[in-house]
């Protein structure tokens, strides 16, 4: 039976803006239930003028949107919900793979954030040219990423996930390492995307403000989406001071497996527009709260300056 973790998550966001401003907006990732997580008892509180939950067309990701249209002091919003997350193990790959469904082929596309040409293509071909099945190619890409990237604890937030930089630098945090996996996988003909989420505390009560996490998943026809978290392998290796040999159990586990201490907030989507559409250009990725004041975005990458947030977890 799959292991699970349950608790209450309380996300509080405050926005520093001029008291007389009439144009302050916030978008917060809004989690939903799926086969490995149950989200319930959602409550929204704050001194905003109005709010709503909106879906983004391309990815289907949801956002809690709120705005302040009258002069206000101390703008704040709190999203509280109950979550139960289950461990996911998907390692029973089919002996024969069918064709990639049409609706999944978009996860093979090259984008400005997820390039599949140049150095990325070169690496993809070099490590998968003797592999036939998608699951085998994905494993080869995963192994390469684990062996050829390192976690940089000084990287801000979860990193920017800029593959053109990371394919040379090969160091960063979870968005960086996961984006490298997605790029190389796509270049090798493996449908892949990022998963943007939040860790659940392991203690009865825990501050999880620094708990945002990005991992990846790939698609095997006839089997579905499969998790792969090379970024967590590299984090564990850094924290526990493990070399590749000492990390073999973790390397094996995180290909096709993720533990119960996380929920997904959003999937895919890089350089896209939220709903309602933000004013200050496309957003790199949607995992942290995003805010605009008078049409200009506040620093959102775990900045904790004008846009501040706190995440508290309380176990059930």
Predicted feature descriptions by range:
Residues 28-32, 81-85, 95-97, 196-198, ...:
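A mature extracytoplasmic/lumenal domain signature
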Residues 26, 141, 216:
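Terminal peptide-recognition signature
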Residues 179-277:
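Hydrophobic/aromatic-rich core segments of domains that either
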Residues 249-316:
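Low-complexity, Gly/Ser/Thr/Pro-rich intrinsically disordered linker/tail segments
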Residues 1-88:
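Intrinsically disordered, low-complexity N-terminal segments that are enriched in acidic
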Residues 84-87, 152, 171-174, 199-202, ...:
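Solvent-exposed loop/turn segments at secondary-structure junctions
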Residues 137-141, 170-185:
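Active-site nucleophilic cysteine motif
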Residues 76-168:
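Acidic low-complexity segments
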């Amino acid at each position: 039976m799959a292991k699970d973790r349950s608790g209450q998550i309380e996300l509080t966001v405050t926005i520093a803006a001029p008291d007389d401003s009439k144009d302050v907006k916030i978008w917060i990732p809004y989690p939903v239930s799926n086969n490995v997580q149950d989200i319930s008892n959602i409550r929204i509180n704050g001194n905003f003028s109005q709010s709503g939950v909106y879906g983004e067309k391309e990815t289907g990701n949801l956002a809690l949107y709120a705005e302040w249209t009258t002069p206000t002091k101390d703008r704040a919003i709190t999203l509280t919900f109950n979550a139960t997350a289950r461990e996911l193990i998907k390692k029973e790959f089919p002996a024969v793979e069918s064709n990639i469904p049409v609706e999944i082929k978009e996860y093979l596309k090259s984008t400005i954030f997820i390039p599949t040409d140049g150095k990325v293509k070169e690496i993809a071909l070099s490590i998968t040219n003797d592999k036939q099945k998608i699951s085998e190619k994905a494993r080869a890409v995963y192994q390469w990423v684990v062996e050829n990237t390192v976690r940089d604890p000084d990287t801000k937030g979860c990193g920017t996930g800029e593959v053109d930089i990371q394919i040379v630098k090969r160091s960063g945090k979870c968005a960086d390492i996961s984006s490298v996996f997605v790029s190389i996988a796509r270049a090798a003909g493996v449908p892949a995307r990022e998963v943007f989420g939040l860790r659940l505390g392991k203690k009865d009560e825990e501050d999880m403000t620094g708990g945002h996490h990005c991992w990846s998943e790939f698609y095997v026809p006839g089997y579905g989406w499969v998790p792969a978290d090379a970024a967590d392998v590299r984090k564990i290796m850094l924290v526990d001071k493990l070399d590749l040999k000492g990390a073999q159990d973790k390397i094996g586990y995180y290909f096709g497996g993720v533990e119960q201490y996380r929920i997904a907030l959003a999937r895919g989507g890089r350089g896209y527009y939220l709903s309602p559409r933000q004013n200050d250009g496309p957003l790199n990725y949607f995992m942290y709260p995003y805010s605009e004041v008078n049409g200009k975005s506040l620093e959102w990458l775990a900045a904790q300056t004008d846009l501040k947030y706190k995440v508290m977890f309380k176990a059930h």
